[in-house]
Amino acid sequence: MYTYFITGTDTNIGKTAITCSLIAKLTEEGFCVGGMKPVAAGCHIENGHMISDDVKKIAEVSNVDININEINPYQFEAPIAPHISFKKNKKEIDIHLIKKYLRSFENKMDYLFIEGVGGYAVPLTENFSTANLIEALNIPIILVVGVKLGCINHALLTVESILNKKQKLSGWVANRIDGHMLAYDENVSFLKENIKAPCLGAVPYLKNFDPYRASKFIDIAKLNDKVDLY
C-alpha cells in the first residue's frame, strides 16, 4: 500500500478537494484507493454520530469499505484549532491507534491518502503537531499550495520547514482558490522553479468543485517515489 500525507500551506486552501481528486484519479485507473483524516474539527451530529463534511467527501470518493471511525478517529464539533479541542475534551492523540488502522488498511488498498488538519505546523495537542504526526508515521508528503496572494511566502516557508525536518516531499499541487488573483501563471511558474519537488498539477479555480474534473489536471506519475510503507 502506497501511503502519502496530504498537508497544506494554510487552512481552507483545498486539502480535502485535492485529496479527493487524487483518490478519484487513481480509482478511475482501476486501483483500490482510500482516504483518512485522523483529526477533524467543525463536525456535526448526523444520524446520532459526529461527522465531518470533509470526511464524508473522502468516504464517498473512496472505493474501499472502511468504518467512518477508522477514517476519522478524532472528531470535534467546534471549528477551532485542534490543540484547543483536544485540551477542552481532555483527549490525547494516540499514534498507536492510527498505526493500527493503517495496518488494517494494508490488504484493502493500493493507495492511501492521509489528510492533515490545517497547515503543516498546526499543533494537534500542546506538545504534538501535524509535523510530528508525519514524522511518527514516517510517510512522504504531498503539499497543497492554496494559490492566492501571499502563497509564495506560505509555500516556501512550509517547504523549508519540511526539508529542515528531513521529511520527504514527494510532490505538490497548486490549487487556485482565488478566481480573481492577478498574475496567477507567474506565481505558479515561480513556485515550480523554487520548490524542489515535482508539481503534480495546477488545478484551476472551480466554482462547483468536482474531484473527477479536478483530477484531469493532476499527474500522479510525477510523484518522485513510490515506497510501499504499510
Residue ranges and their predicted role:
Residues 17-92, 96, 101-103:
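N-terminal phosphate/diphosphate-binding loop that engages ATP/GTP or pyrophosphate donors
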Residues 58, 98, 102-125:
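Switch II (G3) loop of P-loop NTPases
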Residues 5-19:
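Glycine-rich phosphate-binding P-loop
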Residues 1, 31-32, 107-110:
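Short, high-confidence coil segments that cap the C-terminus of an alpha-helix
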Residues 159-230:
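C-terminal lobe/tail of nucleotide-utilizing enzymes
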Residues 125-148:
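Inter-motif core of Ras-like GTPase G domains
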Residues 5, 113-115, 142-144, 173:
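Structural motif
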